[in-house]
């Protein structure tokens, strides 16, 4: 159970596997814009067909759990992770 936990401001937050994988991908290269297609491929796999809204829903859930300030939507392209100053 502990393997999908993140720590924000000394607070432990448990995440479902896909949310954790999405956060892990985006935070691996802060300020890099990840295209939706690349996110789908890396998190869900090339063989899995998921709707466009799937990524949006997972990002929304991450924003609710760890904070909106960490994610930026690049309209029509994808998302990027932002580290606080």
Language-model segments: residues:
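Positively charged, aromatic-enriched patches within helix-turn-helix-type DNA-binding elements
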Residues: 3-70, 75-77
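C-terminal edge and immediately downstream basic/flexible tail or linker adjoining helix-turn-helix-like DNA-binding
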Residues: 81-85
């Amino acid at each position: 159970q502990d393997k999908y936990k993140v720590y924000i401001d000394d607070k432990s937050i448990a995440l479902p596997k896909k949310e954790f994988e999405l956060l892990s991908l985006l935070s691996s290269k802060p300020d890099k814009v990840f295209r939706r297609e690349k996110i789908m491929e890396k998190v869900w796999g090339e063989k899995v067909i998921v709707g466009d809204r799937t990524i949006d829903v997972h990002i929304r859930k991450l924003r609710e759990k760890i904070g909106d300030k960490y994610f930026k939507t690049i309209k029509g392209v994808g998302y990027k992770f932002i580290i606080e100053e």
